[in-house]
From Swiss-Prot:
Function recorded in the entry: Binds with high affinity to muscular (alpha-1/CHRNA1) and neuronal (alpha-7/CHRNA7) nicotinic acetylcholine receptor (nAChR) and inhibits acetylcholine from binding to the receptor, thereby impairing neuromuscular and neuronal transmission.
UniProt protein name: Long neurotoxin 2
SUPFAM superfamilies: Snake toxin-like
Membrane-spanning intervals of the chain: none
Keywords: Acetylcholine receptor inhibiting toxin, Disulfide bond, Ion channel impairing toxin, Neurotoxin, Postsynaptic neurotoxin, Secreted, Toxin
Tissues showing expression: Expressed by the venom gland.
Pfam families listed in its UniProt record: Toxin_cobra-type
Source organism of the structure: Naja naja (Indian cobra)
Domain of life, per lineage: Eukaryota
GO CC aspect terms: extracellular region
Principal cellular location given in the protein's record: secreted
Length: 71
């Protein structure tokens, strides 16, 4: 499987059986810059914590950098 990986946001090969993930959360600059984003691959979908959104998928390049709606 190929997943986008941060910080470069490039598509890279991940080991067999892994899933791609997109993790987003707010930090102190969330209101002006939007949510922080972490893209990668893992053996299993990371555990969700309070205030953190995680989406996992299992097809090539299924975790693109999320777009932010402009006002």
């Amino acid at each position: 499987i190929r997943c986008f990986i941060t910080p470069d946001i490039t598509s890279k090969d991940c080991p067999n059986g892994h899933v791609c993930y997109t993790k987003t959360w707010c930090d102190g600059f969330c209101s002006s810059r939007g949510k922080r984003v972490d893209l990668g691959c893992a053996a299993t979908c990371p555990t969700v914590r309070t205030g953190v959104d995680i989406q996992c998928c299992s097809t090539d390049d299924c975790d693109p950098f999320p777009t932010r709606k402009r006002p």
